[in-house]
Amino acid sequence: MLLLNPLPRLFEDTMLNRAIVLFVVLLAGAGAVVQANRPETAPPRASFDNFPIELAGWKGQSLPPMDAKILQILGVDDYMNRAYFRADRASAGLYVGYYKSQRQGDAIHSPQNCLPGAGWEPMENGYLTVPIAAAGLPTEISENRYVIQKGLDRQLVLYWYQSHGRVIANEYWSKFYLIRDAVTLNRTDAALVRVIVPIAASLENAESRAETQAVDFVQKLFPLLPAYLPS
């Protein structure tokens, strides 16, 4: 189910986001007092080095390591940056950045801020609900859906925040849970999961095709993530 920038939803989200921000500020103040002398502990997890290179019809390859300056800016403790391909030449770029702690200034960077900095302009934005068929997991997950463009090139971007078994599309809700879990669980570990699929201008219904490919990739990817992003 696709929601493309609906105005009533946008207004409701804006009001809700303001309320969340206020609550996060209040909760953060309380958390700073409660957690001042408590060392943070994150559950053990598998390294992305061990993440499968093949995902049920998708075969991947690791991209060159990121520049040290970029990694310093991102502040990730572990990350995965790969390109995956299907036999029918469909492709998907996968980035997952994991943060063991977000207490010392290292925080997840939203693609909404990073992609324009790389020259990509947002053309459409909304939410996409992806059905998941795997035991012990949600039956569907909600993700951010963006179409971006640079020159004549267009790409479809799906991304979400994942922490402690939750999949969160809204950036403000992710901040709320970050502070709440810091207070109640003494944990701030979390990850950003981003999937990018090129939109082939030469194909009919190119955007719809790209979305179908992205959904298929997410459905193969998501059931494997819990071992690397602990709940």
Regions inferred by a protein language model and the residue ranges of each:
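N-terminal Lys/Arg-rich, disordered targeting/topogenic segments
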Residues: 1-10
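N-terminal Sec-pathway targeting helices
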Residues: 9-23
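Hydrophobic membrane-insertion alpha-helices, especially the h-region
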Residues: 19-33
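Active-site-proximal structural scaffolding
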Residues: 24-25, 51, 214
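Membrane-interface motif at the C-terminal end of an N-terminal transmembrane signal
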Residues: 30-42
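Alpha-helical transmembrane signal-anchor/signal-peptide segments
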Residues: 39-55
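Short extracytoplasmic
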Residues: 52-83
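A cross-kingdom signal targeting lumenal/periplasmic-facing segments of multi-pass membrane
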Residues: 80, 84-220, 224-229
